[in-house]
Amino acid sequence: MRSTAYLTALLSFLGATHAAPEGPRCRCTPDQSCWPSPGLWQTLNKTLSGNLVAVKPVGTVCHDPTYNGGLCDSVKGMQTDSSWRSAQPGAVQSINWETWPEKNESCYIDGPRQVPCGQGRIPLYSAVVQSPLDIQKTVRFASKYNLRLVIKNTGHDFLGRSTGPQSLQILTHNMKSINFTDNFVPEGKPDGRGIGQAVTIGAGVQLNELYEAAGKRGLTQVIGLSTTVGAAGGYIQGGGHSPLGPWKGMSTDHVLEYKVVTAGAKFVTANEYQNSDLFWALRGGGGGTFGVVTSVTLRTFKDPPTIVSQVNVTMDGKANESYWAAVEKFQAYLPTLSDGGCSGYYYMLPNVTLGPQSAAVIIAAFYYANKTDKAHVDNLYRPLFASLSSIPGINVASVSVPVSSSTEAFRSAFDQKPPRDGGGVNILGSRLFSRKLLEAPGGAANLTAALSKLDFKNLQPAIGHLVAGGQVAKNTHIQSALNPSWRKALVHLVISRDWSIDSTFAEQEKISTKLTAEEIPLLAAVEPDMGAYTNEADVNEPRFQQTFWGTNYNTLLRVKNRWDPRGLFFVRSGVGSEAWDKQGLCRA
């Protein structure tokens, strides 16, 4: 049987002990004699056809002694443009990951001009790669000189995995190929027969680019709801939730093949038929850990008609018992919505203050893939709306519109040009919650009680992602490294915290520590064994191995040690990262 052969191949190397051999205790840094000379960097630049860049933070032009008024004005105008940020070697989307607070190094674009810039976590050099061969050359160089290596696709990582201090960056952003096929044949498939429609995308392709290309062909694929997130990077390698998830499953469920440059600088194919252990790990085990993915092949589907729906639940004044009663009823009804084909996102904002007015709201953006009957949605909502409207002070409104395709539905949701969702401070905490919990007596009440104990600043939401259940739950036969809790989950719930750019390190630590030690445990206690989604979670999660991967972690670590025995690839709270310090510079 296919599944038996696949599992046998995956486990074939597990009979022996696979402890990673010890390399040097610390990476080489610029203050050491082992650091490559200028001549060696110049040689690498030549082998990369002039595409090696000495990187400075993008805010450098706004600070003395390198201040440039014209360039600073230009950078200030683009600092929230996530498309611009994704293309810059010296920037990521969340600016807290550009800084190195422990060293008091930052370079905020809006910081005081007279404060000199520090390099922070921004890499010192970037290989702006154009091909797998460029990546192989860069990996060999990093390995030979024992350098800290960082992979950046778009810099959307919420756990700071796209930056690293005193490092060499591989920037895959320019690898933009998109190739569709009517009948994809995985490399090495014994019978040579195709397995259906698919698209192969380069490492730098972003979600909006893939939606546009597929939409022109009347196709879609299971990917996220964003403009500039990279489709082939950490998003899909960490699992990849999607508003199409309940219809078809997780994004990683539909990966047919990866092309990868390994820690040994080999260019390999990973699929069900060859290097199947690596294929398994890359389907949920996290990005930046097992190799540099150069391309991904995904299943495509006929783009379905979709109903787009918005639901607003509001009350005047800040959150009180009525508001939290509405939140409880709303969340208790989520299994029914899911059964009706609903997916999407709901934003719980207990504190919305605009001038003298204040309110507490729930705003939901829902999608009904492969549905055309608006009456179905209206009937589905009727019991929920009646229940909510019975709560004193609660008002409910909704609008639902059928559109011809999911691509039209999703692209209209992020049609802002340029996309203005980058350049902020952002740390996350999250937990997965099961359908079983929400259906159980008191389950939604317990979750709501935990939420009500959190601190919410003005306009600060808790975001519920109704992206599981349905086919995500049914795809248990798919063998991947995805956190098994996804197959039981219905909701992925996220909270975020921030601070101002003039906050001291002590103030930042206080906010971060409170998130880790107080707020997330409140949510985790509601359903302790469910864990969290590795791509959108707290970077300081104390038991990240179990929280992000559950029973899959030990196997993932063995795969990691097989393909990267000396730990060339490192990301914060990634597989094998417990062997290193937080910055990946010295072994723990």
Curated annotation (Swiss-Prot):
GO terms for molecular function: FAD binding; oxidoreductase activity. It is found in: Secreted. Its EC number is 1.-.-.-. Its cofactor is FAD. Keywords: FAD, Flavoprotein, Glycoprotein, Oxidoreductase, Secreted, Signal. It holds the Pfam family BBE. One of its GO terms (cellular component) is extracellular region. Residues 1-19 form the signal peptide. Glycans are attached at residues 45, 104, 179, 312, 320, 351, 370, 446. Residues 118-303 form the FAD-binding PCMH-type domain. Belongs to the oxygen-dependent FAD-linked oxidoreductase family. The modification Pros-8alpha-FAD histidine is found at residue 156. It comes from the Eukaryota. It is an enzyme of class 1 (oxidoreductase). It comes from Arthroderma benhamiae (strain ATCC MYA-4681 / CBS 112371) (Trichophyton mentagrophytes). This is Uncharacterized FAD-linked oxidoreductase ARB_02478. Its main location: secreted. PROSITE patterns: FAD_PCMH. InterPro entries: BBE, FAD-bd_PCMH, FAD-bd_PCMH-like_sf, FAD-bd_PCMH_sub2, FAD-linked_Oxidoreductases_BP, Oxid_FAD_bind_N.
